[in-house]
Amino acid sequence: MNGDIAVFAGNSNKQIAEEICTHLGIQSGKINLKKFSDGEISVKIEDNVRGKEVFIVQSTSAPANDHLMELILIMDALRRASVSSISVVIPYYGYGRQDRKVEPRVPISARVVADLIEVVGLDRILTMDLHADQIQGFFRVPVDNLHFAPVLAEYVNTKKIDDLVIVSPDSGGAERARAFGKKVNGSLAIIDKRRPKANVSEVMNVIGEIEGKNCILLDDMIDTAGTICKAADALLKHGAKSVYCAATHGVLSGEAVDRINSTQFSEVVLANTIAIPESKKINKLKSLSVAPLFANAIQRIHTNQSVSTLFD
């Protein structure tokens, strides 16, 4: 990798940024990030970046508003420093779940965030497993939406799990589960959540054969973990031999870690798109690095090669 490229990291996930730089064979750019006494964010780029192709690594994870503002200010600082191009690497795109109007008088926040980022000025977005594919259309610049599935499939295949069933926790994720099942030679099951009538507990029906099988619950993220833990209990109740869980983004809000710990998961596998604090690291959680995938994409973008092969 030549000296015409620079990678800068915000505070949201410095570890993945450092791993990306290691795979690229470069040092991360020097940046001074701090807060003034009133909470305003201060940004100063310490390196000469004139004419460089710049990549900014920043997940808009919690605290989402701080990390989003930090990203925008880093972009502006670099643009004013006369870089040749800016590509933003957002491993986890916060506000992605608010991708449409679900009731009157609410914003489409995923689009608003896209507008905020784009108005500052950038050339490309590189992200992973957007909550909704249509978010790519909220930007006018190219968006490369990488997938955790190839990294996860490689890990699952090394475990050599017999009688494997890939389970979608809802009907919306069925296609994701089906596609992943082909990579690991697993069959498909879907959990159908129904509420028989008002004020009656939700019933989880399992569609597919899971009795005596090893199940992997597959989702794009784990937030409070309520859904996946209830789904795991339902699978075990229906005779599953074991239950694993795999998701790209470990948001892990509220009591998520406690819920996971008290549920009979054999293992919960996450990508490292969001930095997990030490207080939330438990034995059941397994983190897989997607830094090599992002580094490969960055290298291909830098050398004008196709990125599409990374989507397989």
From Swiss-Prot:
GO terms for biological process: 5-phosphoribose 1-diphosphate biosynthetic process; purine nucleotide biosynthetic process; ribonucleoside monophosphate biosynthetic process. Belongs to the ribose-phosphate pyrophosphokinase family. Class I subfamily. It comes from the Bacteria. The keyword Cytoplasm applies. The lineage of its organism: Bacteria, Pseudomonadati, Spirochaetota, Spirochaetia, Leptospirales. It is found in: Cytoplasm. Its EC number is 2.7.6.1. This is Ribose-phosphate pyrophosphokinase. InterPro entries: PRib_PP_synth_CS (IPR000842), Pribosyltran_N (IPR029099), PRibTrfase_dom (IPR000836), PRTase-like (IPR029057), Rib-P_diPkinase (IPR005946), Rib-P_diPkinase_bac (IPR037515). It comes from Leptospira interrogans serogroup Icterohaemorrhagiae serovar Lai (strain 56601). Involved in the biosynthesis of the central metabolite phospho-alpha-D-ribosyl-1-pyrophosphate (PRPP) via the transfer of pyrophosphoryl group from ATP to 1-hydroxyl of ribose-5-phosphate (Rib-5-P). Keywords: ATP-binding, Cytoplasm, Kinase, Magnesium, Metal-binding, Nucleotide biosynthesis, Nucleotide-binding, Transferase. ATP binds at residues 38-40, 97-98. D-ribose 5-phosphate binds at residues 195, 219, 223-227. Its cofactor is Mg(2+). GO terms for cellular component: cytoplasm; ribose phosphate diphosphokinase complex. Pathway: Metabolic intermediate biosynthesis; 5-phospho-alpha-D-ribose 1-diphosphate biosynthesis; 5-phospho-alpha-D-ribose 1-diphosphate from D-ribose 5-phosphate (route I): step 1/1.
